[in-house]
């Protein structure tokens, strides 16, 4: 019973909602860019014997005899490289940010970065916008996940963390699937519409999260334990002082 109460605290629920928004945005981005840079269709073969008849048959059947060019292969490589780099950067920066600020600030900060990235992508050329949004969104989602895990351990110290993380991760995966479904529904629209939709969703998540964590985001000192506080010799969880930083 105590575990359920801890896991249903407002801080954890609000952070889980923000994390679900970011995961949905990642799923949306994945399918949006997959459709944007998909390959083209081959036209009617026009070489060798029967070239003229093949072209004529294609015209009669109202087929595209020339085909539609797909995105260059290096576009995929550039977007994937940015997404991978963003994920690595987020995993690298989150522990360092945790030493400087509380988890609520990290989550709100990466929400803002993801929102700014999706808005700016709509004004950039296709490949440049895709690279920017994949880099910033992957990094934001990675940092937010580590901050969320830390927040759960901080606010629910007596909970079964393995089971709790598995439960939340399952919900986040459903959010990812929901985001990808939305991308499928608007796949035939211009990619700028997709960026606008993504920015709208992340922006709503930011508007939801900020007012509900105003008190928790106040500047407070991070107290790092230096002596073992557990029977197995492990250090205790980082806590926050009630004194504000100057």
Describe the residue ranges of each PLM region.
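Juxtamembrane intracellular "pre-TM" segments in multi-pass secondary transporters
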Residues: 1-24, 226-245
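A single, central transmembrane helix in multi-pass transporters
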Residues: 4-89
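Intracellular juxtamembrane helix-capping segments at the cytosolic ends
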Residues: 33, 143-156
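Loop-to-transmembrane helix entry/capping segments in MFS-fold secondary transporters
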Residues: 73, 104, 158-168
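Helix-to-loop junctions at the C-terminal end of transmembrane segments
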Residues: 88-103, 187
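Structural signature of the two symmetry-related core transmembrane helices
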Residues: 105-119, 199
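Helix-loop junctions at membrane interfaces in 12-TM secondary transporters
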Residues: 120-134
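Multi-pass alpha-helical transporter architecture, strongest
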Residues: 121, 196-239, 245
């Amino acid at each position: 019973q105590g575990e359920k109460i801890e896991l249903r605290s407002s801080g954890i629920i609000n952070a889980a909602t923000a994390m679900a928004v970011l995961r949905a945005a990642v799923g949306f981005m994945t399918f949006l860019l997959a459709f944007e840079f998909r390959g083209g269709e081959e036209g009617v073969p026009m070489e060798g014997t029967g070239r003229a008849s093949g072209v004529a048959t294609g015209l009669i059947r109202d087929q595209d005899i020339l085909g539609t060019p797909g995105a260059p292969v290096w576009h995929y490589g550039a977007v994937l490289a940015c997404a991978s780099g963003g994920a690595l950067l987020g995993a690298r920066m989150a522990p360092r940010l945790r030493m400087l600020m509380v988890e609520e600030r990290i989550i709100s900060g990466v929400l803002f970065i993801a929102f700014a990235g999706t808005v700016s992508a709509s004004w950039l050329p296709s490949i440049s916008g895709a690279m920017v949004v994949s880099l910033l969104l992957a990094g934001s989602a990675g940092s937010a996940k580590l901050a969320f895990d830390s927040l759960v351990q901080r606010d629910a110290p007596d909970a079964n963390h393995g089971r709790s993380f598995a439960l939340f991760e399952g919900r986040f995966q459903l959010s990812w699937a929901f985001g990808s479904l939305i991308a499928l529904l608007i796949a035939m629209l211009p990619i700028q519409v997709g960026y606008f939709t993504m920015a709208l969703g992340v922006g709503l998540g930011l508007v939801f999260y900020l007012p509900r964590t105003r008190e928790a985001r106040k500047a407070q000192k991070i107290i790092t334990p230096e002596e073992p506080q557990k029977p197995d010799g492990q250090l205790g969880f980082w806590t926050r002082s009630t004194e504000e930083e100057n």
